[in-house]
């Protein structure tokens, strides 16, 4: 029996018949690629997951075996919720018009990168390379020293190109 006064988000949705899926963004710990916080590359990666859940994209069990896996357990209707990074990505995904994305419930997030970094047209951040610094901040791959050692130079070159 659930105490509805003390549910976490997952339990809230699970007891109502929803499946809960978590996926890491590009460059976050345990994933591939480089963190590019808020860019079209990052939004497209999450869009691919929604397309898979909707039945419009093929996914594979791993990078080498070429064994396809379907989300046959999914109704194809995808909702999103979250705060901060997880809230921000929802706004970006909603602008793509991806089929299957139904409600978004961003508890907190950046809806406008321009407004987030500017006030009345003037930058509110003294850091010249703010987007690069934000990318470094959101990048979780540096938490795994063995993994980060394999990408450090390329990631640095990518961020400051």
Name each region found by the language model.
Residues 20, 78-82, 86, 90-94:
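Conserved catalytic-core segments centered on acid/base and nucleophilic motifs
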Residues 3-7, 15, 43, 61-63, ...:
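Accessory cap/linker subdomain of secreted extracellular hydrolases
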Residues 28-31, 86-89, 111-116:
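Flexible loop/turn segments at secondary-structure boundaries
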Residues 1, 20, 52:
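Serine-hydrolase catalytic-loop signature spanning alpha/beta hydrolases and amidase-signature enzymes
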Residues 12-16, 71-74, 97-98:
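Extracellular/periplasmic catalytic domains that process cell-envelope and extracellular macromolecules
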Residues 36-41, 48-84:
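Gly/Ser-rich "nucleophile elbow"/oxyanion-hole loop immediately N-terminal to the catalytic nucleophile
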Residues 1-6, 28-43:
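Accessory recognition modules or surfaces
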Residues 14-30:
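Conserved alpha/beta-hydrolase
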């Amino acid at each position: 029996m659930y105490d509805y006064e003390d549910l976490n988000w997952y339990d809230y949705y699970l007891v109502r018949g929803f499946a809960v899926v978590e996926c890491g963004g590009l460059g976050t710990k345990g994933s591939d690629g480089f963190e590019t916080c808020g860019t079209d590359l990052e939004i497209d990666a999450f869009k691919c997951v929604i397309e898979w859940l909707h039945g419009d994209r093929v996914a594979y069990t791993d990078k080498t075996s070429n064994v396809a896996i379907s989300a046959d357990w999914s109704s194809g209707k995808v909702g999103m919720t979250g705060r901060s990074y997880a809230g921000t990505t929802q706004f970006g995904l909603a602008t793509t018009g991806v089929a299957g994305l139904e409600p978004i419930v961003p508890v907190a997030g950046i809806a406008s990168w321009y407004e987030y970094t500017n006030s009345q047209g003037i930058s509110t951040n003294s850091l010249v390379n703010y987007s690069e610094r934000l990318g470094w901040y959101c990048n979780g791959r540096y938490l795994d020293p063995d993994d980060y050692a394999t990408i450090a130079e390329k990631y640095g070159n990518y961020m400051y190109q």
